[in-house]
Structures are given as C-alpha cells and as structure tokens.
Amino acid sequence: MLRTVSNAFTTRSHVGSTASSNSWSTIVPALARFGSIGVLRAAVELINDGEKPDASPLVHLLRVSGNYGYVSLCRQLHGYVTKHGFVSNTRLSNSLMRFYKTSDSLEDAHKVFDEMPDPDVISWNSLVSGYVQSGRFQEGICLFLELHRSDVFPNEFSFTAALAACARLHLSPLGACIHSKLVKLGLEKGNVVVGNCLIDMYGKCGFMDDAVLVFQHMEEKDTVSWNAIVASCSRNGKLELGLWFFHQMPNPDTVTYNELIDAFVKSGDFNNAFQVLSDMPNPNSSSWNTILTGYVNSEKSGEATEFFTKMHSSGVRFDEYSLSIVLAAVAALAVVPWGSLIHACAHKLGLDSRVVVASALIDMYSKCGMLKHAELMFWTMPRKNLIVWNEMISGYARNGDSIEAIKLFNQLKQERFLKPDRFTFLNLLAVCSHCEVPMEVMLGYFEMMINEYRIKPSVEHCCSLIRAMGQRGEVWQAKQVIQEFGFGYDGVAWRALLGACSARKDLKAAKTVAAKMIELGDADKDEYLYIVMSNLYAYHERWREVGQIRKIMRESGVLKEVGSSWIDSRTKCSSY
C-alpha cells in the first residue's frame, strides 16, 4: 500500500534497521521520542509487510509524516484509517484533522469531522480555529454556534477562537454575549489569554471603554495585554490614551512601538511617527515599512522615494515588502530609472522572484508603459499565483492592448489550479470598455463571470459595461444595467455614465444623468460633475451655462484639483 513512499524514504535514509527486526512495541516509542525519517521508514515497512498498527502508532505516524510534509503518505494513512474502521477513534481522527488543518485543507478536515460519531471539544476547536486562522471568519462563527448547541461543552479555546472571529467581523453583540458567558463560567478571571482576546475584540469593534475596562480588571497582564490595549487606542484614534498606556508599560517591545508608528501615520502625523522610530531601541524593517506605506497610501509618492533613500543610508535591510511598497510609489510617479534601480536591488537581494515583488515590478513596468519588461517578469517567474496573472492582465488593460489581455485571460482559464476571480473580470471588462471590443463579446464575458464562475457583479464591473454602452450611444441600455443590478442609488454608476456621455459629447444625455446625480445628493462637492458639464457646455458654445456652473462651484466651495508634474534627479523626486 505504501511501497512507493517507502522507496522514497529508502533514498533519503541509510538507517540499517529493517522491518523484521522491529515491532510496533519498539517503533511507537521511537516515533514518539525521535520522529526521524529512519524510524518513519521502518514503520512504513512494517505496514507493507502486513504488520497492522492499531490507533496509537497511527497517531504518531500522522504527526511525524505531517511534520516532514509527506502529504501523500498522510493521505494514504487516512485511507488506511477509513478502510480498517479507525474513524470512530476520536484521538486518531483529531490527528487527521490537525494534519489537514496545517496543510490548508480545511475541506478535508471538515470531512473527517463529519465522519466522527462522537467529536470531542478538541475536534470542534481544531475546526473552528482552522477556519478563523485561514480568514474564513463567518464559517468559524457558524461552527462555534453549532458547538454551543451541541452536547459538547466549549472551553476557553473555543471562546477565544470565536472572539477572534467576532473581532474581524465587528460582531460586537455576539462578542459581548461570549464575554458574559465567560464571566458566568469563571473563565475570564485570571486568564490572560481570554483577557487579551476580549481587549482585541472590543478594540476592533470600536468599544474602547469596554476594552479599557477589561484591561483594568485583569489580575495579571503580559506584554500581549499591553500591546492589545495600545493597539486598540491607536486603532480608534485615541492617541493620547495610547501614549499614556505606552508610558505606563513596563517593557515596551517592537510590536508596541510599531503600533504607535502605525497610529501616527494613519492620522497623518509623520513627525511623531519619525520620533517614535528614532526612540526605538531596535527598529525592524516593519517599523520603517509602516512609514513608507503611510506615504504611499497618502499619495505622497515623492516623499516615499525620499524615505526609501533614507532607509538605505540608515543601513536598513530591505525585505520583499519594503521593495513592493516603494515600487508602488515609483509606479505612481512613472519614474523608470528609479524602478530599474529597485529592480536591480531586488535581484541582488534574491527577492525579485518573490510573488509580492514580482507582481509589484509587473505593475510598475506596465504603469510606465514598458510592457515588454512586464512580460519578461511574468513569463520568467517560476510560480505564478492569481495575483500575478491579474497584474499582467491589468497591465495590458492599462496600456490598451485588448488582444493580449484576452489571450492571457484564455490561458489563465486553462490553468489547472487557478480560476479567474472578480479582479480578473474587472480588468478584462475594463480593457474591453476602453478598446471598443464588440459589445456582444463584452456581454459574453459578463455572463461568463456570473453564470460560469458564480461571481456577483460589483458596481465596478457594471461601470465598465455602462461606459461601453454610453460610448456607443446606448444610454437607455446603460440605465437599464444600472437599475437591473441594483445600483440606481449608487453615484459611482451614474458617474461612469456621465463620463461616457462626455466622451460622445452628448449634452442631452449628460444633462439627464447630471440631474440624477444631483437628485442623489452626490453633486455638492463633486468637482467631476461640474467640470464635465462645464466642458460639455463649452464644447457646444453654451457660454452662459459655463459661467453659471463656475459660479455655483465658487459658491459651493468646489475647487478644481491642481495638477502637478514630477522631475526625478539622481537623489530625489521633485514636483512642480
């Protein structure tokens, strides 16, 4: 049964022992104590020679096989467990679930769970925590509620996993109910882990008073407790309170300092962020990256490149995230020499093949109009995930190359382990819209997205369709799309249609759309609406209306955004 795996072990190990000189009585202690490949090989040979193990050896076999990443062997052991009726052994089934959970195969773990006649609290906790740790918070919560209704009594680990999911989903009512249950069961008092989870949950749900109350009532606090309360203050804009806790903290660590830096950056206070960074005993790359990210997110790309230079002069060792962040800044500025320099730096550090860096390089080169460089990055990558495929399709879309975008999309559909997602179709529909691909082709992709891939259209998907219809003079059909997909009250959809009317210089249709936007209340501070209508009236030489619109803009305080350009020198980027 396991002969091929056994042969694989033979090539990896030169252990002299053979199956004939071993028995399960000697193998099991060796597996439990050492868990080496040689011992594992001997165990596999025993099975192949007809020595059937009971549940205890199988538990150790699964653990050791999982530790070495022998997925195929673990799956074969699962088959052996099922075939020989060991499914009812709770401990063994829990070991199988643990393996599948650590192998990111939650569906398989859930199948094992469903086959168990009497799952215990460890079984439930393994699955609940698995869903939460993999970001599937709703499924984790549903399973926790199912546990609560079952005959199995949840323990502190059940509750902390559920609290983590509540925090991410902002389910404060459920979180408060769990808190009450913990108090009733006496699991809150004296339990640092439970207290930390409660602080995190209340902080992420925006209930700072409750977070502080939990913190103050904790009999014992560790570093995680202090970091949780500082992070909660920072997350909710309570910077002064966060600083107060920071100064009370016995031994702030890197996480504490990074939380403060992040809080100052998000509030736009870069000076204090720098101060915290300079006060840090041992800042790591994450500390610097937080400020770098802040600049990029604040659309201060020039400052981001300057700060990146400062990082280099300060001797900071760049990681893949440092490079991907600064590449986003370079892409926004379209400064090719900087991009080439960072690409060379990434190559020197051996990081250019990392997915996060490679996708950022593809994005940067495509935004700079250097599609050949982007293509070279894409095709030379040893492994490509969906993000990279989407980035390349987006690059073609951005540069108006509908033929290559569609060709790459068709290649993606042939990939065995990948399938297009909402972002793939967003890029595909965008390139179809801008390149005047026949409407029936575009509608075909739209229907494929809904029917074949079960993706619900977002307003962004519909906007591409709306623009294409509007640019072809099919304003009535575009309005139908807006209403049919439930975006009649979404200003973004009407904005897209207004842009299409503007491209066709269709003043009559534009006036109808503008009236709808005003009705929705999206016009008060929307410079786009006023500028489009002003330009359309000017095109049709309706100067009186142009004057009226500009007067309304002045009275409403709507200002046209001032444009700027960038010049890059050898050391920095300057704007004018």
From Swiss-Prot:
Pfam hit, one: PPR
Keyword DNA-binding: no
Keyword Chaperone: no
Disulfide pattern: none
One GO MF term: RNA binding
Residue spans of the PPR repeats: 20-53, 54-88, 89-119, 120-154, 155-189, 191-225, 226-252, 253-287, 288-318, 319-353, 354-384, 385-419, 421-452, 458-488
Matches recorded under PANTHER family: PENTATRICOPEPTIDE REPEAT-CONTAINING PROTEIN (PTHR47926)
Protein name: Putative pentatricopeptide repeat-containing protein At5g47460
